[in-house]
């Protein structure tokens, strides 16, 4: 019953994956005939293989995040399993860190803050493309707590700074609810365009097509939270329960974005947050 496996994974905020072993009908019949405790014939094996192949097509819809298929005995023999940390798990990064809260489009203030913290911020322009490089002489790293955009006068330069710092390894960025809303708008999803988002949209209209095209991947790659410094530090936008740290699920992302909610929405269409801390 694969449904119970999916439910178990979700309960513990894990990402379910599937490994499908399908070496072919002939191999399955041969292996079945070599087992004296299996009295059913080849037709039963054919039906079972056919059913398994039909069900494979729905594994992603069932909730499996990744599916690996091994289609021969050689593939099975050659397969290895490697444990890979989830993208939230950056415990090996020990900093030191500067944690920066919601910037909300205030690029000048962000640059002033970074300068006061000892970062070198250098702007350049080539072929009409505005670029920025940010580094710290002592290799400190910024951790942005989300909500880079909306409300402020210059969300585009805030994005430039954050994108440059992530690309160079000078920063981590977790996703805020405003960042996710912009991501959804860029993907053509239906969102409520309130005052803050409209400001960001207007600012983006003045940017190059290349810059606008670089945003969807950056925003979609933002993690729900980041786990740092050998497990001593976890950073999320709205908060996170201890059992969710370092885990990956839709529930973890929603909690990190909005905190614990009551299930209701306010007059702005935003989730009503419960007092949970």
Located regions from the model:
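Active-site neighborhood of divalent metal-dependent phosphoester bond hydrolases
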Residues: 44, 137-139, 151-235, 242, ...
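Conserved GTP-binding G-domain of TRAFAC-class P-loop NTPases and closely related GTPase folds
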Residues: 11, 23-83
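Short glycine-/polar-rich loops that comprise or flank the Walker A/P-loop
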Residues: 12-17, 63-66, 140, 169-171
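Conserved beta-sheet core of the metallophosphoesterase superfamily
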Residues: 244, 270-277
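Glycine-rich phosphate-binding loop used to anchor ATP phosphates in small-molecule kinases
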Residues: 1-21
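N-terminal active-site segment of His-dependent metallophosphoesterases
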Residues: 75-159
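Short hydrophobic beta-strand that contains or immediately precedes a catalytic carboxylate
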Residues: 99-101, 144, 173-175, 235-236
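Short, solvent-exposed loop/turn segments at secondary-structure junctions
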Residues: 26, 104-105, 179-180, 240-243
């Amino acid at each position: 019953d694969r449904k119970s496996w999916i439910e178990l994974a979700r309960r513990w905020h894990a990402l379910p994956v599937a490994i499908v072993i399908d070496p072919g009908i002939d191999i399955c019949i041969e292996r079945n005939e070599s087992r004296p405790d299996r009295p059913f014939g080849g037709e039963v094996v054919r039906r079972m293989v056919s059913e398994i192949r039909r069900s494979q097509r729905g594994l992603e819809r069932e909730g499996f995040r990744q599916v690996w298929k091994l289609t021969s005995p050689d593939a099975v023999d050659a397969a290895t399993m490697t444990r890979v940390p989830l993208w939230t798990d950056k415990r090996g990064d020990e900093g030191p860190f500067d944690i920066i809260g919601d910037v909300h489009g205030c690029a000048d203030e962000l640059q002033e803050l970074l300068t006061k913290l000892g970062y070198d911020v250098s702007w350049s322009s080539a072929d009409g493309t505005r670029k920025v490089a940010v580094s710290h002489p002592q290799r400190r790293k910024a951790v942005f707590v989300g909500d880079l955009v909306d409300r402020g006068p210059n969300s585009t330069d805030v994005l430039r700074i954050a994108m440059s710092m992530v690309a160079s390894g000078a920063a981590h960025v977790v996703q805020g609810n405003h960042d996710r809303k912009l991501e959804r708008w860029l993907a053509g999803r239906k969102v409520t365009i309130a005052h803050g988002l409209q400001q960001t949209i207007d600012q983006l209209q003045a940017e190059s097509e290349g810059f606008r095209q670089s945003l969807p991947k950056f925003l979609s790659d933002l993690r729900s939270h980041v786990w740092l410094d050998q497990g001593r530090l976890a950073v999320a936008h709205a908060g996170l329960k201890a059992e969710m740290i370092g885990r990956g699920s839709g529930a973890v992302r929603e909690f990190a974005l909005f905190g614990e909610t009551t299930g209701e929405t306010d007059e702005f269409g935003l989730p009503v947050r419960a007092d949970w801390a």
